[in-house]
């Protein structure tokens, strides 16, 4: 626009000059009309021309000034169009270079604490218009750059220690290491002290270690007497390094003067817990080794934030449980040490505030910790996620139980009236029915061609976790089956929850089993119940049967109490292909202990079934377990919920029936469909605890 403005002014000046010269030339007939002979009077025409040209000159001058200013403003803002991710959020390292626009001269808007009883309504209001008010609130936060200096971080010797050039610790809050002899600036690490809700320096927010800063990282952990490390990034995301692996996979490794030995590693569906024994390797050191726990949250997606805050809340509780009261600051890091790190710290602090004051003040707390480390909580989506986590915590609280308290809890549930005039168990289940069914995420299942493949049109998979089949050449919609991936206790997508096959979907069923390498099928319905078809018989009674490119041959059929165990030899042969046939053994566990109406009378049969399935999985490699009843929700959800709950009881001595079922309902609608089925989950857990000693082989 800039070249345009001088050109415009030049042409205007030329026009003005030409107009002035016209007074000295003889006008033509087409220019003038006169009733008198001779030239016109210049005194009458010149003022008229001036009055016409002056407004035009003023207008052009204003336009030129506007375009010049607009051009300058555009230069001041980084063009981020090429850096946008699919959900519109900039990735951490990209955002770090975005220039901040100047604040409104009227000053930042004030946001007040929110009483917890108003939290749900406030979130609803802020979420309207695509979270417009959340964005406004987030954009009103101070950046934190103005309040501090960064002299140490910007020293030439320290620049290579920073993962990102403009994510730096303030001088007044940086973690200071002991100075190493002969090494200038060896007291520097990109890490900052961060306060908790009431506790000063409760956390250390750090960047993910680089290869050249790993030694400094462990030196910091030792010198600060930290017993807990919280890791909120994966080592690589989208093929880019986010954090250097600063621990050995097994055995011991020495980082600088700190020896780190792996003591234990427990992998769960949302996070991994590693235990390290660390000890300084100095000639005159006689200090005792220390135990350090690393809790690595693995469910933060490459883009945006977790789909639900449930996993983060469970993770945060585990951090609180494992961190000793006498220990130094909790070390929290992601990649840059501001976005996910800040989100975690704010949720922790606001949960403490709920306990203490029954209110939250997210805006004030984020503003405060940004004075300690700039850009903490890096995106408006992370900021919104904090509120969602706090609402989840307020609405549902902590429903986790120790196994020793289960019996007392059940007595409370069955005997306590609520303000809804229902017993506690019914009220707990009522909360589950409030989990919203996300119909906007069911587009594929609601296509006309796919609706014909559903037994119950209300029970179809969400798009984000549906099981996808290979597309048949030239045949639309052949990648669809009414089946959802469901997380297990230790492994994501451990189950495939599906309906009982229909006659025209049985080929898709076997394609799913084959393509996803499922060696285990759990069937929780009869082929017919109450004279109604519940499931097409998708296996042969004897010999073999072929569905599409897959042949199923029955090899054995045995009945053990209430479970039929059938072994199938499954053969895949692609027509016209030169490759050899592929074969695989698949075992079906057909549970006959579920009555046509209601629930099983006792839990032992379900415990036996889960134990048998787990044993089969250990022998075949833990590929997805195919689970179905008729619609793929009620009994299917109950089996999966109990599998996850009992696995946790064995591993941790803890259970959370409510959150286990709630998590399933977020992955497939109507999982654990009735109050009876929900109560049955509690009953089976109680039976399992009572007879636990008889099931040592369950492990």
Curated annotation (Swiss-Prot):
SUPFAM superfamilies: (Phosphotyrosine protein) phosphatases II (SSF52799). This is Receptor-type tyrosine-protein phosphatase epsilon. Its EC number is 3.1.3.48. Residues 20-41 are annotated as: Disordered. Monomer. Isoform 2: Homodimer. Can form oligomers. Dimerization is increased by oxidative stress and decreased by EGFR. Isoform 2 interacts with GRB2. One of its GO terms (molecular function) is protein tyrosine phosphatase activity. Isoform 1 is highly expressed in the brain, lung, spleen and testis. Isoform 2 is highly expressed in thymus, spleen and lung. Isoform 1 and isoform 2 are expressed in primary hepatocytes. Isoform 1 plays a critical role in signaling transduction pathways and phosphoprotein network topology in red blood cells. May play a role in osteoclast formation and function. Acts as a negative regulator of insulin receptor (IR) signaling and is involved in insulin-induced glucose metabolism mainly through direct dephosphorylation and inactivation of IR in hepatocytes and liver. InterPro entries: Prot-tyrosine_phosphatase-like, Protein-Tyr_Phosphatase, PTP_cat, Tyr_Pase_AS, Tyr_Pase_cat, Tyr_Pase_dom, Tyr_Pase_rcpt_a/e-type. CDD domains: R-PTPc-E-1 (cd14620). Glycans are attached at residues 23, 31. The tyrosine-protein phosphatase 2 domain (D2) mediates dimerization. The extreme N- and C- termini of the D2 domain act to inhibit dimerization and removal of these sequences increases dimerization and inhibits enzyme activity. It catalyses: O-phospho-L-tyrosyl-[protein] + H2O = L-tyrosyl-[protein] + phosphate. The chain crosses the membrane at residues 48-68. One of its GO terms (cellular component) is nucleus. GO terms for biological process: cell surface receptor protein tyrosine phosphatase signaling pathway; negative regulation of insulin receptor signaling pathway; regulation of mast cell activation; signal transduction. Keywords: Cell membrane, Cytoplasm, Glycoprotein, Hydrolase, Membrane, Phosphoprotein, Protein phosphatase, Repeat, Signal, Transmembrane, Transmembrane helix. Pfam families: Y_phosphatase. The active site is at 334 (phosphocysteine intermediate), 629 (phosphocysteine intermediate).
């Amino acid at each position: 626009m800039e070249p345009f403005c001088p050109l415009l002014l030049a042409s205007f000046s030329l026009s003005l000059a030409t107009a002035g010269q016209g007074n000295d030339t003889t006008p033509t007939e087409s220019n003038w009309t006169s009733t008198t002979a001779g030239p016109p009077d210049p005194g009458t025409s010149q003022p008229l021309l001036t009055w016409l040209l002056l407004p035009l000159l003023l207008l052009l001058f204003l336009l030129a000034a506007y375009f010049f200013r607009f051009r300058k403003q555009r230069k001041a803002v980084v063009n981020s169009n090429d850096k946008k991710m699919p959900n519109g959020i900039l990735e951490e390292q990209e955002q770090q270079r975005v220039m901040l626009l100047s604040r409104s001269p009227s000053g930042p808007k004030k946001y007040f604490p929110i009483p917890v009883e108003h939290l749900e309504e406030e979130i609803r209001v802020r979420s309207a218009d695509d979270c417009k008010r959340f964005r406004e609130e987030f954009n009103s936060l101070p950046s934190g750059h103005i309040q501090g200096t960064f002299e140490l971080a910007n020293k030439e010797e320290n620049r290579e220690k920073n993962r990102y050039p403009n994510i730096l610790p303030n001088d007044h809050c940086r973690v200071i290491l002991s100075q190493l002899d002969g090494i200038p600036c060896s007291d520097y690490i990109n890490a900052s002290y961060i306060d908790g809700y009431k506790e000063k320096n409760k956390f250390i927010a750090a960047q993910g270690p680089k290869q050249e800063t790993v030694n400094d990282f462990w030196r910091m952990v030792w010198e600060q007497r930290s017993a807990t490390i919280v890791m909120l990034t994966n080592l690589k995301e989208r093929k880019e390094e986010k954090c250097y692996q600063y621990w050995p996979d097994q055995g011991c490794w020495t980082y600088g003067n700190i020896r780190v030995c792996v003591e234990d590693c427990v992998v769960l569906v949302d996070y991994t817990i590693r235990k390290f024994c660390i000890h300084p390797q100095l000639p005159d050191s006689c200090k005792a080794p220390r135990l350090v726990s690393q809790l690595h949250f693995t469910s933060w997606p490459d883009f945006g934030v977790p789909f639900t805050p449930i996993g983060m809340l469970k993770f945060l509780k585990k951090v609180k449980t494992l961190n000793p009261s006498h220990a130094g600051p909790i070390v929290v890091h992601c990649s840059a040490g501001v976005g996910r790190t800040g989100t975690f710290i704010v949720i922790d602090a606001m949960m403490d505030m709920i306990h203490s004051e029954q209110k939250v003040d997210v805006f004030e707390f984020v503003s405060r910790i940004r004075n300690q480390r700039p850009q903490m909580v890096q995106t408006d989506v992370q900021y919104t996620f904090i509120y969602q986590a706090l609402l989840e915590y307020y609405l549902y609280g902590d429903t986790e139980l120790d196994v020793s308290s289960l019996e007392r809890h059940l007595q409370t549930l069955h005997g306590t009236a609520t303000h809804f005039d229902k017993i506690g168990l019914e009220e707990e289940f009522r909360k589950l029915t409030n989990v919203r069914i996300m119909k906007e995420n069911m587009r594929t299942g609601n296509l006309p061609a796919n609706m014909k493949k559903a037994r119950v049109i209300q029970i179809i998979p969400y798009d984000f976790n549906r099981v996808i089949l290979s597309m048949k050449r030239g045949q639309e919609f052949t990648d669809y089956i009414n089946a959802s991936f469901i997380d297990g206790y230790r492994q994501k997508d451990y189950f495939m929850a599906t309906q009982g096959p229909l006659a025209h979907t049985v080929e898709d069923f076997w394609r799913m089993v084959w393509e996803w390498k499922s060696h285990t099928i759990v069937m929780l319905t009869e082929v017919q119940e109450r004279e109604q078809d519940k499931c097409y018989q998708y296996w042969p009674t004897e010999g073999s049967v072929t569905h599409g490119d897959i042949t199923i041959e029955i090899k054995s059929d045995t009945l053990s109490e209430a479970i039929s165990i059938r072994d199938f030899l499954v053969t895949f042969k692609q027509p016209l292909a030169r490759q050899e046939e592929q074969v695989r053994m698949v075992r079906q566990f057909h549970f006959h202990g579920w009555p046509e109406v209601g629930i099983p009378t006792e839990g032992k049969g379900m415990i036996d079934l889960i134990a048998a399935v787990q044993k089969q999985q250990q022998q075949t490699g833990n590929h997805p377990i195919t689970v179905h009843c008729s619609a793929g929700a009620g009994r299917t959800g109950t089996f999966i919920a109990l599998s996850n709950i009992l696995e946790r009881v064995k591993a941790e001595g803890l259970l959370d029936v409510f959150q286990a079922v709630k998590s399933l309902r977020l992955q497939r609608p109507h999982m654990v469909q009735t109050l009876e089925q929900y109560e049955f989950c509690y009953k089976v857990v109680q039976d399992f605890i009572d007879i636990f000693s008889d099931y040592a082989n369950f492990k």
